[in-house]
């Protein structure tokens, strides 16, 4: 028997020691359920059981003791109308000292001006428990990250907004994940014109060029290659 009127997700993609764990119950259709039973399990067995009414709100706080030590938890939510069980659903969460103990990778790749108000990705990351999000191709150019104005056109001809990038960083942090910047330090555009000797080349001497736009550079020539401050 499965619930069709609700699903549940944690309010963050991952929790650090001491962070209070909240479960968000989201309604997906009509239901007669008026209260729930919450059960937490570890590999050692059942860890916690509690009940609450749905009238108490869509967020259920778990005991603070849950986040006092590291571990992973399976969550089972059972929905009832009085004593009749209507269905159930599941989610999970983990508690860590640092995200590097259990990284789960996701990415964002759209940074247009229209995207800066969109927040749907936060719920998706929470549902999928993705806790480290790479901002892919967020920059103006591979060898010149920041444009002169907020709105820019990247090397692929796509419109972007640095305000949208900043807003999405805030959104990623708000849902408990970490934001990391993609940076192809081996790729260059205008820089290669000043230092063609740093280009990787085939045996015939022709430079290695990706999609006819990005020159592949020999990053071992540190005395010649410029590494921009944001990459350090």
Which residue ranges define each predicted feature?
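Active-site-adjacent "subsite" loops/lids of carbohydrate-active enzymes
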Residues: 181, 185-228, 232
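An acidic-aromatic substrate-binding cleft motif
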Residues: 87-141
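Short edge beta-strand/loop segments characteristic of extracellular beta-sandwich folds
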Residues: 20-28
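Extended acidic/polar, glycine-enriched regions
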Residues: 46-100
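The substrate-binding groove and active-site-proximal loops of carbohydrate-active enzymes
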Residues: 102-115, 145-162, 217-224, 228, ...
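Short, compositionally biased P/S/T/A/G/V-rich stretches that sit at domain boundaries
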Residues: 1-16
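Beta-strand-rich binding/interaction modules
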Residues: 32-44, 75-77
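Aromatic-lined carbohydrate-binding/catalytic grooves of carbohydrate-active enzymes
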Residues: 121-166, 177, 186-206
């Amino acid at each position: 028997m499965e619930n069709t009127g609700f699903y549940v997700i944690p309010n963050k993609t991952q929790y650090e020691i001491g962070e209070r764990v909240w479960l968000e119950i989201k309604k997906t259709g009509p239901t007669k359920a008026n209260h729930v039973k919450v059960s937490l399990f570890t590999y050692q067995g059942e860890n916690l059981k509690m009940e609450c009414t749905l009238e108490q709100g869509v967020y259920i706080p778990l005991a603070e003791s849950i986040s006092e030590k590291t571990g992973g938890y399976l969550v089972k939510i059972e929905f009832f109308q009085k004593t009749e069980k209507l269905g159930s659903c599941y989610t999970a969460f983990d508690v860590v000292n640092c995200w590097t103990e259990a990284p789960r990778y996701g990415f964002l790749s759209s940074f247009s001006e229209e995207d800066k108000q969109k927040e749907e990705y936060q719920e998706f990351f929470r549902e999928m428990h993705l806790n480290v999000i790479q901002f892919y191709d967020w920059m103006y150019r591979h060898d010149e990250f920041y444009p002169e104005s907020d709105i820019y056109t990247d090397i692929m001809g796509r419109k972007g907004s640095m305000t949208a990038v900043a807003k999405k960083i805030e959104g990623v942090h708000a849902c408990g994940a970490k934001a990391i910047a993609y940076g192809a330090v081996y790729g260059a555009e205008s820089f290669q014109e000043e230092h063609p000797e740093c280009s990787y080349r085939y045996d015939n001497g022709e430079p290695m060029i990706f999609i006819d736009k990005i020159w592949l550079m020999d990053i071992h020539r540190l005395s010649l290659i410029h590494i921009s401050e944001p990459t350090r």
